């Protein structure tokens, strides 16, 4: 049995076959990128009716971008994982995609919307890194634009010991994913194991470990306001963890 490991911290790895399996696994769990992109575009337009451009930070394999391109004249992405970015580039050959870190990127232009979805923000290690990322988001959004962030669970909403499991099959490959979540200080530790099987490949085993910070709602709001953005939290969202929206030019406002 082959064994590989990818460990994600503030620089989440998401490399090798884990990156290749990413979309198959999450779509098998019911993630609907098309619907999420449509809802996200509607949210952006609610705050910025003339929005024409969007930057997706931590764009992963570019699944959201593929659908967002139908709603905005210009879409760009930023991704830390080189392997995830390579998949995104294959999927979105006409989009400009950047290899970079949400804590310190500088693209030299602004967008109608800056988004960071699927709780990618949780890979940051603490308040200083969260503040740095929101400052970068604010620096890349137009004065009449909007910043949208999907958080990880708040501490009071996290379920220690949570186990998730599922099996998906596509193109002759079967993947079973099992994860276990535990509390590790002010963060979630998620251990994930995959069994991947196919007629010609046999069975391989892969595992990854992620530490995802359990920021409080107040910590997110502090980062938004420090970056000069008003902030509003909306319950629900794509994964049930809610969404934060921020508008430029209203430092210190929380709604």
Curated annotation (Swiss-Prot):
SUPFAM superfamilies (alphabetical): S-adenosyl-L-methionine-dependent methyltransferases
Signal peptide: none
Gene Ontology biological process terms in this record: antibiotic biosynthetic process; methylation
CDD domains to which the protein is assigned, alphabetical: AdoMet_MTases
EC numbers, comma separated: 2.1.1.235
Top EC class of this enzyme: transferase
InterPro entries recorded: Methyltransf_25, SAM-dependent_MTases_sf
GO molecular function, a single term: protein homodimerization activity
Highest taxon, organism lineage: Bacteria
Reactions this protein catalyses: dTDP-3-amino-3,6-dideoxy-alpha-D-glucose + 2 S-adenosyl-L-methionine = dTDP-alpha-D-mycaminose + 2 S-adenosyl-L-homocysteine + 2 H(+)
Pathway(s) served: Antibiotic biosynthesis; tylosin biosynthesis
Annotated function: S-adenosyl-L-methionine-dependent methyltransferase involved in the biosynthesis of mycaminose, an essential structural component of the macrolide antibiotic tylosin. Involved in the last step in mycaminose biosynthesis by mediating dimethylation of the hexose C-3' amino group.
Domain-level remarks: His-123 is a strong candicate for an active site that hydrogen bonds to a water molecule which in turn hydrogen bonds to the C-3' amino group. However, it is not conserved in related S.venezuelae DesVI methyltransferase and its mutagenesis does not completely abolish catalytic activity.
Protein name: dTDP-3-amino-3,6-dideoxy-alpha-D-glucopyranose N,N-dimethyltransferase
Native source organism of the sequence: Streptomyces fradiae (Streptomyces roseoflavus)
Taxonomic lineage of the native organism: Bacteria, Bacillati, Actinomycetota, Actinomycetes, Kitasatosporales
